[in-house]
Amino acid sequence: MDQLIDALLALSPDVRYVAIRQGAELVLRERAGLAGASGAESDRYEELLVNPTLLTLTTQRGNIDAGGLRYVLVRYGNFFQFVLPVPGGQVSIALEPRAVSVELLEPITAILRRHELVS
């Protein structure tokens, strides 16, 4: 997982944080020296509680008549949170608010595809 996280952080200086949860395993890494960063405990609960719930709800809605769910993009005050479902969990990436985040979504997805986490 370290190579995947390294690749995602190297994609752009606008990638603030990467978290990968698969089953009970959660790996988080934050870029050093961030302004407006969340606390480590807050990030942990977001990955264990908030993002899985968000993905469950939006996946169920997407499966009704919207063609499923590819990802969720949340705009918090200090950053964007890009959350993708993967087998047994999610990949969550915080992006700087100045970033044209939509432009980073496809390169992020391509890296996850190379690591066989999304199709």
Q: Across the structure, where does each feature detected by a protein language model lie?
A:
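Non-catalytic interaction/Regulatory regions outside core domains
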Residues: 1-119
